[in-house]
């Protein structure tokens, strides 16, 4: 039965991830005044399936001087972690209702750094290594603000369990009282998932393709799948934290529809940003975090910690 639950979680995520690649190519196509994929199947709907078949039947080549174990392990770890992050997500019921769901998500997203570092180092290529070092520095840096923003939200929520956020947001979405944090959170999720305008890890003009430059076929597909699964996961988390859907226990389907709609809108904004903005310079990327976001989030976190103490009260549902 538990295996069935896992399959019911994993299969829709994989389908969503596959069609997100198609939606992205279509949106970018229309924003650049062209059609996008439209050959395979009606309106190009079977393109993701064709891509998957093509990638997984190709021979997985690797550089002669690369470390075989790490080279294979890195994409597998990246994809496994991307799927594991969904375990505590309330949709409306999570796979395992963890008491410290937020901490679990933070810990696993930090582990994703290892897969990037291993892939860059094991490839034995200077481009891959520089791309990996950039990606690691960027991911670790932006995780600092994500953690502080999460702490502020949890102060409003009163617990580290994600499912209680629906109760907290019954009367008002947290995006309204916490809008500066919500804006910084959204920009940080763009940087965390290595998306434009923060896609410095794959600067084509200087690094060819970043840390996965030596990968081909199946392992490359795993990295690609991990990236898009992470994008959907981050947007689902944003929807849960700041745009909580109303949960009526008699009609749990309404929660799911509401939740998916918000996640889709946020994902569309990700794609819109990618089509609209040029890439940041590396020093600008780091200045934005360490000189703008970090002082602001720390100040706002102190404010949210002091509010319950000053009002001698506790957060809503405790």
Swiss-Prot record:
Keyword 4Fe-4S: no
Location(s), subcellular: Mitochondrion inner membrane
Entry GO MF terms: NADH dehydrogenase (ubiquinone) activity
InterPro entries assigned: NADH_UbQ_OxRdtase_su1/FPO, NADH_UbQ_OxRdtase_su1_CS
Chain ranges passing through the membrane: 2-22, 37-57, 69-89, 100-120, 136-156, 171-191, 231-251, 253-273, 293-313
EC number: 7.1.1.2
Keywords for this protein: Electron transport, Membrane, Mitochondrion, Mitochondrion inner membrane, NAD, Respiratory chain, Translocase, Transmembrane, Transmembrane helix, Transport, Ubiquinone
Pfam family of the protein (one): NADHdh
Signal sequence residues: none
Primary localization: mitochondrion
BP GO annotations: mitochondrial electron transport, NADH to ubiquinone; mitochondrial respiratory chain complex I assembly
Catalytic activity line of the entry: a ubiquinone + NADH + 5 H(+)(in) = a ubiquinol + NAD(+) + 4 H(+)(out)
Membrane topology: Multi-pass membrane protein
GO CC term, one of those recorded: mitochondrial inner membrane
Record family assignment: Belongs to the complex I subunit 1 family.
Subunit structure: Core subunit of respiratory chain NADH dehydrogenase (Complex I) which is composed of 45 different subunits.
PANTHER family registered for this protein in UniProt: NADH DEHYDROGENASE SUBUNIT 1 (PTHR11432), NADH-UBIQUINONE OXIDOREDUCTASE CHAIN 1 (PTHR11432:SF3)
Role this protein plays: Core subunit of the mitochondrial membrane respiratory chain NADH dehydrogenase (Complex I) which catalyzes electron transfer from NADH through the respiratory chain, using ubiquinone as an electron acceptor. Essential for the catalytic activity and assembly of complex I.
UniProt cross-references to HAMAP family, sorted A to Z: NDH1_NuoH (MF_01350)
Listed name of the protein: NADH-ubiquinone oxidoreductase chain 1
Taxonomic source organism: Zaedyus pichiy (Pichi)
């Amino acid at each position: 039965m538990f295996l069935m639950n896992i399959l019911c979680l994993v299969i829709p995520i994989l389908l969503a991830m596959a069609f997100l690649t198609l939606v992205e190519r279509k949106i970018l196509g229309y924003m650049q005044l062209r059609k996008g994929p439209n050959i395979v199947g009606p309106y190009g709907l079977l393109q993701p399936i064709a891509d998957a078949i093509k990638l997984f039947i190709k021979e997985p080549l690797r550089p002669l001087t690369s470390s075989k174990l790490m080279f294979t392990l890195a994409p597998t770890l990246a994809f496994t972690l991307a799927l594991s992050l969904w375990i505590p997500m309330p949709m409306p019921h999570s796979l395992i209702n963890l008491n410290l769901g937020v901490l679990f998500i933070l810990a696993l997203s930090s582990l994703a750094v290892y897969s990037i570092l291993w892939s860059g180092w094991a490839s034995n290529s200077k481009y891959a290594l520089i791309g990996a070092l950039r990606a690691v520095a960027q991911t670790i840096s932006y995780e600092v603000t994500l953690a502080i923003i999460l702490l502020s939200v949890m102060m409003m929520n009163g617990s580290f369990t994600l499912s209680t956020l629906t109760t907290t947001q019954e009367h008002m979405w947290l995006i309204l009282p916490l809008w500066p944090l919500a804006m910084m959170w959204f920009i940080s999720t763009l940087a965390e998932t290595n998306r434009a305008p923060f896609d410095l890890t794959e600067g084509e003009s200087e690094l060819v393709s970043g840390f996965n430059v030596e990968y081909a076929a199946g392992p490359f597909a795993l990295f690609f799948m991990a990236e898009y699964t992470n994008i959907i996961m981050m947007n689902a988390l944003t929807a849960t934290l700041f745009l909580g859907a109303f949960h009526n226990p008699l009609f749990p389907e309404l929660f799911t529809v509401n939740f998916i709609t918000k996640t889709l809108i946020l994902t569309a904004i990700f794609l819109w940003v990618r089509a609209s903005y040029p890439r940041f310079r590396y020093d600008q990327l780091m200045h934005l975090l360490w000189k703008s976001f970090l002082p602001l989030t720390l100040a706002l976190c102190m404010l949210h910690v002091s509010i319950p103490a000053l009002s001698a009260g506790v957060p809503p549902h405790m």
